[in-house]
Amino acid sequence: MIAYAIGLLGLLIASIQDIKSREIENYIWIGMAVIGLLLSTYLSFTTGNFMPIISSISGFIICFIIGYLMFVLGIGGADGKILMGMGALIPSYAFPVYSSLQPLYTMEYIPWFPLLVFFNGVILMIVLPIYLFFKNLSNGVKPKKLKEYVLMLVGEYITVAEAKKGNKVVLGKGKDVKLIPSVNDDKNYDLSKYKDTQYVWATPELPLLVPIALSYIITPFLGDKILSIILPM
């Protein structure tokens, strides 16, 4: 329970930092990993069972490999770092509510909990386009072309004044809309060429760490229900 609470604190701090700057401080994931290794070492020596320290080390290594691949593929650096921290801190967790894949969890050297948290977080992220679509509909957006339907899934049709309130990537206006803009291009954040009353398409740019943090909270109760539906055993 201590490890879980520390992980939750780390994820909350990391999510706030990721929202503000799109980066997280290294002390968060390193702190999670170090504390996890220390706690598992203490538990192993006090109980005479060395499985906790083995699980912590193997969890860190496996999550490090996954995190590094994410970084190389440009999927997310901060998300990979937090995954590494979770791998060492809390590689396993008892699922009291739902688990159809229970036989797999006997392989204690695999960090099932961090991987499941990450998987459920990605699923939550996929729900965002559905939310954006219906939000645009409720705001009176009436799509006529296929491109407009796609835009309703990836962005919001809002005024420039609204876009200035948050950290949003501007997709454009009219025929100049880009469905896949570069988040590293400063021009996508430049709203000076528009009037505050003009409407533009903009993406909320929600970092993956936010749904991962939410997944961290609900996964002990949700378990692997979503995964078991996709991959029935």
Swiss-Prot record:
<feature type="topological domain" description="Extracellular">
    <location>
        <begin position="73"/>
        <end position="78"/>
    </location>
</feature>
<comment type="function">
    <text>Cleaves the N-terminal leader peptide from preflagellins. The processing of preflagellins is necessary for assembly of flagellins into a flagellum structure.</text>
</comment>
<feature type="transmembrane region" description="Helical">
    <location>
        <begin position="208"/>
        <end position="219"/>
    </location>
</feature>
<feature type="topological domain" description="Cytoplasmic">
    <location>
        <begin position="90"/>
        <end position="110"/>
    </location>
</feature>
<feature type="transmembrane region" description="Helical">
    <location>
        <begin position="50"/>
        <end position="72"/>
    </location>
</feature>
<feature type="site" description="Essential for catalysis">
    <location>
        <position position="18"/>
    </location>
</feature>
<keyword id="KW-1133">Transmembrane helix</keyword>
<feature type="topological domain" description="Cytoplasmic">
    <location>
        <begin position="220"/>
        <end position="233"/>
    </location>
</feature>
<feature type="transmembrane region" description="Helical">
    <location>
        <begin position="24"/>
        <end position="46"/>
    </location>
</feature>
<keyword id="KW-1209">Archaeal flagellum biogenesis</keyword>
<feature type="site" description="Essential for catalysis">
    <location>
        <position position="79"/>
    </location>
</feature>
<feature type="topological domain" description="Extracellular">
    <location>
        <begin position="19"/>
        <end position="23"/>
    </location>
</feature>
<comment type="similarity">
    <text>Belongs to the peptidase A24 family. Archaeal preflagellin peptidase subfamily.</text>
</comment>
<keyword id="KW-1003">Cell membrane</keyword>
<dbReference type="Pfam" id="PF01478">
    <property type="entry name" value="Peptidase_A24"/>
</dbReference>
<dbReference type="GO" id="GO:0005886">
    <property type="term" value="C:plasma membrane"/>
</dbReference>
<feature type="transmembrane region" description="Helical">
    <location>
        <begin position="111"/>
        <end position="139"/>
    </location>
</feature>
<feature type="topological domain" description="Cytoplasmic">
    <location>
        <position position="1"/>
    </location>
</feature>
<protein>
    <recommendedName>
        <fullName>Preflagellin peptidase</fullName>
        <ecNumber>3.4.23.52</ecNumber>
    </recommendedName>
</protein>
<dbReference type="GO" id="GO:0006508">
    <property type="term" value="P:proteolysis"/>
</dbReference>
<keyword id="KW-0645">Protease</keyword>
<keyword id="KW-0378">Hydrolase</keyword>
<dbReference type="GO" id="GO:0004190">
    <property type="term" value="F:aspartic-type endopeptidase activity"/>
</dbReference>
<feature type="topological domain" description="Extracellular">
    <location>
        <begin position="140"/>
        <end position="207"/>
    </location>
</feature>
<dbReference type="InterPro" id="IPR052218">
    <property type="entry name" value="Preflagellin_Peptidase"/>
</dbReference>
<keyword id="KW-0812">Transmembrane</keyword>
<feature type="topological domain" description="Cytoplasmic">
    <location>
        <begin position="47"/>
        <end position="49"/>
    </location>
</feature>
<feature type="transmembrane region" description="Helical">
    <location>
        <begin position="2"/>
        <end position="18"/>
    </location>
</feature>
<feature type="transmembrane region" description="Helical">
    <location>
        <begin position="79"/>
        <end position="89"/>
    </location>
</feature>
<dbReference type="InterPro" id="IPR054964">
    <property type="entry name" value="Arch_preflagellin_pept"/>
</dbReference>
<dbReference type="InterPro" id="IPR000045">
    <property type="entry name" value="Prepilin_IV_endopep_pep"/>
</dbReference>
<keyword id="KW-0472">Membrane</keyword>
